């Protein structure tokens, strides 16, 4: 029948004289489309030939109904062709009995209704469709899983307040639960979802589900019209029921004029202009402070230079000035080695006088016949001999100031200094022994005249008091010690040397028997007070024989002193029982302690070597010639 209607409609559309105008053609096409849809549905149903369940629904958790499709038997009121059976599954019953639908009419066509007498919760149901005794579809479910409440009813809204600009308003929407749901007694608990949109919009805005029957809506435009709809679901379920009827909301305007669009502050433009202004200011600051910013971002690399040295001197090549500047700094001074030609100075640390009161070697040496007070000129040099060596004039002035002697002694000193400068010729002509000294007996004083005096620096004994002891003890020279090492410093600041090898046998003397007259101001020594160097006035004793003398003003051993001493001492005949004479010591070997020094023995002069008659300090070449 439907097919014949479709063919008739197409025939009518094909005739151009039947309808006039575009509207008539549109209506005809719509009718033809509906007819084709019906024919297609009939063809699909008839082609499959099997009815199916469409849905099973419980509106209030007390009753439920199931619906199915049967287009092939449309219009037939007899139920003999399609039947629905149900059963309640029970794990204890193995053979379950299927029962036919209790009501085919109450829920509508092609449906089965189960009232409260046939409905049980917490139990599974299974339903099936049969056609002419054969099963065509089957479905199992729980009643609480198919709950889809009816739509809420009684929707209305209330205006709560409006904004000060009369542009926005707040409302509250209320509704009632579904009539079929027993919400008051608590048999069922529902959640409600509200959806809202403007009238001219197509997209609904969903609100969060609530359990109450009222929802506030804020900031609604007063010049707009809104649509609201609500649906419900069982709590903890995801199946919503049908939507309620649409509620139309039109907010009243407070002024007779049409509400215009709200004035929006131009934040975007302000941000653009602000960024532009900040950029301009930053560029201005960068250009004005370009050098300083460059120094902060890229600090300059420091130029390599020597502290205290002007780099212009290095560029100009003035090496003499650079060397002078480097010599001022201690860390730039060259180190002295043993083979260096520079003079090495000895620095002695003087201990407290309280630490040397008892048990010192000085008391032992000064208590016996070995006590010989040379009354040597003493002065403590605070710079370890630098001033006395390089500035002899200053030291002589200090000695004269501290000496306390009269100015009558100065001509004698100058005369002796002149004699010391050129002693080579005098000593060669006036030497009591013309033969060159024996290497083993050089620089040895005859034992009969005077015993060798230890280099003991004292300050109280005089030459007049020691003269009887020197004459009365002529044999003690053989047993006297040479002192080669500093062993102690007395509380008064005097230096005591340690004894060396003894000469046990007596030494023969020259025929002239010269007596070595040592001037007592030919050595520097340190007193107890390091700040006030004292100078002892020498007492020169006139001897009958010509004696080698040392320079009085110079506190250090010079070439002339060594040369004169070597030439004046004759080659005495060695006793058979005597030992080899000890040489003088000229250099430091080991520093054992701040007060202990071991000196290296210098080689005795050979017979064929001649001493240089140079004036001044001992140079390296002269010292090597003396030591050979």
From Swiss-Prot:
GO terms for molecular function: cytokine receptor activity. Keywords: Cell membrane, Disulfide bond, Endocytosis, Glycoprotein, Membrane, Phosphoprotein, Receptor, Secreted, Signal, Transmembrane, Transmembrane helix, Ubl conjugation. The lineage of its organism: Eukaryota, Metazoa, Chordata, Craniata, Vertebrata. This is Growth hormone receptor. It is a single-pass type I membrane protein. It comes from Cavia porcellus (Guinea pig). Disulfide bonds join 56-66, 101-112, 126-140. Glycans are attached at residues 33, 40, 46, 115, 156, 161, 200. Receptor for pituitary gland growth hormone (GH1) involved in regulating postnatal body growth. On ligand binding, couples to the JAK2/STAT5 pathway. The chain crosses the membrane at residues 267-287. CDD domains: FN3 (cd00063).
């Amino acid at each position: 029948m439907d097919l014949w209607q479709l063919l008739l409609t197409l025939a009518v559309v094909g005739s151009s004289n039947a309808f006039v105008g575009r509207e008539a053609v549109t209506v005809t096409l719509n009718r033809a489309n509906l007819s084709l849809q019906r024919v297609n549905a009939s063809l699909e149903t008839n082609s499959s030939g099997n009815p199916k369940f469409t849905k099973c629904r419980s509106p209030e958790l007390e009753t439920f109904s199931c619906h199915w499709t049967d287009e092939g038997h449309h219009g037939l009121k007899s139920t003999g062709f399609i039947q629905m059976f149900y059963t309640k599954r029970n794990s204890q019953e193995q053979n379950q009995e299927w029962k036919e639908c209790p009501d085919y009419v109450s829920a509508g066509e092609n449906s089965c209704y189960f009232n409260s007498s046939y409905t049980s919760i917490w139990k599974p149901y299974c339903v099936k469709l049969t056609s002419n005794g054969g099963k065509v579809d089957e479905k199992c479910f729980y009643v609480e899983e198919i709950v889809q409440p009816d739509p809420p009813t009684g929707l209305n809204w209330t205006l709560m307040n409006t904004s000060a600009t009369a542009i926005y308003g707040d409302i509250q929407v209320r509704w009632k639960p579904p009539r079929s749901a027993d919400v008051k007694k608590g048999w069922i608990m529902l959640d409600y979802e509200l959806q809202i949109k403007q009238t001219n919009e197509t997209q609904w805005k969903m609100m969060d589900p609530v359990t109450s029957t009222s929802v506030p809506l804020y900031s609604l435009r007063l010049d707009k019209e809104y649509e609201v709809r609500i649906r419900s679901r069982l709590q903890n379920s995801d199946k919503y029921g049908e939507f309620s009827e649409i509620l139309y909301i039109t907010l009243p305007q407070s002024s007779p004029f049409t509400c215009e669009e709200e004035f929006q502050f131009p934040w975007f433009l302000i941000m653009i202009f602000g960024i532009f202004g900040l950029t301009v200011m930053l560029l201005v600051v960068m250009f004005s402070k370009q050098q300083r910013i460059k120094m902060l971002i890229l600090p300059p690399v420091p130029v390599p230079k020597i502290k205290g040295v002007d780099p212009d001197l290095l560029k100009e090549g003035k090496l003499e000035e650079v060397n002078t500047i480097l010599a001022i700094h201690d860390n730039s001074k060259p180190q002295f080695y043993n083979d260096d030609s520079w003079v090495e100075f000895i620095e002695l640390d003087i201990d407290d006088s309280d630490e040397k009161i008892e048990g010192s070697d000085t008391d032992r040496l000064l208590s016996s016949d070995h006590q010989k007070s040379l009354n040597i000129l003493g002065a403590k040099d605070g710079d370890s001999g630098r001033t006395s060596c390089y500035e002899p004039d200053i030291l002589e002035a200090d000695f004269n100031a501290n000496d306390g002697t009269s100015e009558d002694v100065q001509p004698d000193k100058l005369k002796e200094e002149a004699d010391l400068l050129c002693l080579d010729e005098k000593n060669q002509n006036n030497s009591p022994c013309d033969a060159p000294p024996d290497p083993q007996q050089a620089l040895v004083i005859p034992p009969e005249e005077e015993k060798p005096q230890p280099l003991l620096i004292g300050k109280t004994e005089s030459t007049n008091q020691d003269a009887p002891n020197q004459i009365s003890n002529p044999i003690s020279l053989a047993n006297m010690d040479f002192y080669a090492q500093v062993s102690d410093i007395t509380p008064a600041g005097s230096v005591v040397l340690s004894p060396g090898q003894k000469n046990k046998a007596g030494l023969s003397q020259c025929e002239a028997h010269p007596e070595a007259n040592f001037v007592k101001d030919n050595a520097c020594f340190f007193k107890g007070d390091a700040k006030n160097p004292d100078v002892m006035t020498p007492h020169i004793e006139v001897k009958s024989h010509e004696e080698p003398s040392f320079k009085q003003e110079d506190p250090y051993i010079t070439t002339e002193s060594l040369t004169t001493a070597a030439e004046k001492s004759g080659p005495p005949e060695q006793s058979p029982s005597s030992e080899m004479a000890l040489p003088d010591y000229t250099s430091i070997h080991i520093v054992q302690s701040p007060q202990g020094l071991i000196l290296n023995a210098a080689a005795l002069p050979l017979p064929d070597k001649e001493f240089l008659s140079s004036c001044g300090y001992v140079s390296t070449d002269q010292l090597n010639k003396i030591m050979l």
